[in-house]
């Protein structure tokens, strides 16, 4: 395997060296993509909807986390109101249509459908009505709905009852919830995504504690009162994969034949680059990809976790039964790929004295600079360095490693710091974002030309919104939200650029 990986790296290096970068002023056009290619924006329920105590919605773990631990969120903010898309969805869909977008990715709030998390606790008909109205509005405006079933906001009731995704009891409850969604919305929804970024939910929620439910080992820096960073992330990821497979099975058996839809999962990965041209760093780079991307892609395409994870994590990594492995292998019609940034990777030695943790298990060290130069321009968020070529490299890696699956880029975007000293006119000038999308679309188009089966691209995001631990301190939107004046929406220059792109 190691020899194959080294040969792959050499092949990628040779192909990369022959590639030209996008030239300044070079134009990327909609006409360079297939006619049936989807262009949309992505969102999630907790970040957009607000109305957390309206319409029969039950509490989610994010309601609990933001209110119990405001110190973990920038400015102690929360998503109680967010950008109020619950009440303003018609206005928002109108903005999409005006831009010329033909798709919209949003998530259903599990506790808005099942306030107590379980079927036995009752179905919230108001929640079903809201999503029916949103779906109908999208379709009436020619916008294809891509619906995510889980974007991190699991019901607080299940967290209290059995620990949420730490328990395999979640599989049956998630299946029941998904079954309702397929039954109620599947006649119009043709693209389903089971989970958004199971890596982020597992790591942020259970390894470093920066996301809900905020668990990690006490040795960490995040001040967690409960958790085990060496075990819980692997358990939670495992249960998400089992729940995903169970939901895909029920969709294929009960609904897909009649509804003619597709189902997949959205996986996030950084692109990884060896820090030095050494055997150690090249092997470490493969391990880094395994521990972020292969952790989910290997089970989905091969039925088991990467060998590197089995070797290094040992008995802390759960095992699939033969039946589970068979159910997970091939349990997708498409892969959603979320890409934002890249990292240099160094190999490290095993420290027998260190506490077991996901962050050290891969024996890798991430770097954002080499020889005093950053890997790319730094964006608003501390973790986001702009590296456009990485999206092409990750797509080509997926084609070579995982048998060229159908892919939708389900998230790609960049943020700026929310600078309250800027005037509204100044805040709408986002040339960095225009260049970000221009460069990334250029590299997606290059991947297409090299045979990658990419069929859509979703920008993150249509609007500025609640950005998890960053709260409202950063802005990812192509449209500006005025948090001081009734959440009014204003198009940034990137919105106008995207509109022009879609009409060329």
From Swiss-Prot:
A beta-D-glucoside binds at residues 47, 151, 196-197, 340, 411, 460, 467-468, 476. Keywords: Disulfide bond, Glycoprotein, Glycosidase, Hydrolase, Signal. The active site is at residues 197, 411. GO terms for biological process: carbohydrate metabolic process. GO terms for molecular function: beta-D-fucosidase activity; beta-galactosidase activity; beta-glucosidase activity. Disulfide bonds join 216-224. The keyword Signal applies. Its EC number is 3.2.1.21. Transmembrane segments: none annotated. It comes from the Eukaryota. InterPro entries: Glyco_hydro_1 (IPR001360), Glyco_hydro_1_N_CS (IPR033132), Glycoside_hydrolase_SF (IPR017853). PROSITE patterns: GLYCOSYL_HYDROL_F1_2 (PS00653). Residues 1-18 form the signal peptide. Glycans are attached at residues 75, 329, 371, 421. It catalyses: Hydrolysis of terminal, non-reducing beta-D-glucosyl residues with release of beta-D-glucose. Belongs to the glycosyl hydrolase 1 family. This is Beta-glucosidase 24. It comes from Oryza sativa subsp. japonica (Rice). The lineage of its organism: Eukaryota, Viridiplantae, Streptophyta, Embryophyta, Tracheophyta. The gene is BGLU24.
């Amino acid at each position: 395997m190691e020899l194959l990986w080294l040969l792959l790296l050499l092949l990628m290096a040779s192909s990369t060296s022959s590639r030209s970068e996008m030239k300044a002023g070079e134009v990327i056009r909609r006409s360079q993509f297939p006619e049936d290619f989807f262009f949309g924006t992505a969102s999630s329920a907790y970040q957009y909807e607000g109305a957390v105590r309206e319409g029969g919605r039950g509490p989610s773990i994010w309601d609990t986390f933001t209110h119990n631990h405001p110190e973990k969120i920038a400015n102690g903010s929360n998503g109680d109101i967010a950008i109020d898309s619950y009440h303003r969805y018609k206005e928002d869909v109108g903005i999409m249509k005006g831009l010329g977008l033909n798709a919209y990715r949003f998530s259903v709030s599990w506790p808005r459908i099942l306030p107590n998390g379980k079927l036995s606790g009752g179905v919230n008909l108001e929640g079903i009505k809201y999503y029916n109205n949103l779906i109908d509005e999208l379709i009436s405006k020619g916008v294809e709905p891509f619906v995510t079933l889980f974007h991190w906001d699991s019901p607080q009731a299940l967290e209290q009852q059995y620990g949420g995704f730490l328990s395999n009891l979640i599989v049956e409850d998630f299946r029941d919830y998904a079954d309702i969604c397929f039954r109620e919305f599947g006649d119009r929804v043709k693209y389903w995504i089971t989970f958004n970024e199971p890596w982020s939910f597992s790591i942020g929620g259970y390894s470093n504690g920066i996301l809900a439910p905020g668990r990690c080992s006490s040795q960490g820096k995040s001040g967690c009162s409960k958790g085990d960073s060496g075990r819980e992330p692997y358990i939670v990821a495992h249960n998400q994969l089992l729940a995903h497979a169970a939901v895909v099975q029920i969709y294929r058996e009960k609904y897909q034949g009649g509804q003619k839809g597709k189902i997949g999962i959205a996986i996030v990965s950084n692109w990884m680059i060896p820090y030095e041209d050494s055997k150690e760093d090249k092997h470490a780079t493969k391990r880094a990809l395994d521990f972020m991307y292969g952790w989910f892609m290997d089970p989905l395409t091969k039925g088991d976790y990467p060998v590197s994870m089995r070797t290094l994590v040992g008995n802390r990594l759960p095992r699939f039964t033969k039946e589970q492995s068979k159910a997970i292998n091939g349990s997708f019609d498409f892969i959603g790929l979320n890409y934002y940034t890249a990292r240099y990777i160094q190999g490290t030695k095993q420290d027998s004295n260190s506490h077991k943790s996901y962050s050290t298990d891969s024996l890798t060290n991430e770097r954002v600079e080499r020889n005093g130069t950053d890997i790319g321009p730094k964006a608003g968020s501390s973790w986001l360095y702009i590296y456009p070529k990485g999206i092409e490299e990750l797509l080509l890696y997926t084609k070579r490693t995982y048998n060229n699956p159908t892919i939708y880029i389900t998230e790609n975007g960049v943020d700026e710091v929310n600078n309250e000293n800027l005037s509204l006119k100044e805040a709408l000038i986002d040339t960095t974002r225009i260049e970000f999308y221009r460069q990334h679309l250029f590299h997606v188009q290059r991947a297409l030309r090299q045979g990658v089966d990419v069929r859509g691209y979703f920008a993150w995001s249509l609007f500025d919104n609640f950005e998890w631990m960053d709260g409202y301190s950063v802005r990812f939107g192509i449209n500006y939200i005025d948090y001081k004046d009734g959440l009014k929406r204003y198009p940034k220059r990137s919105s106008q650029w995207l509109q022009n792109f879609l009409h060329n």
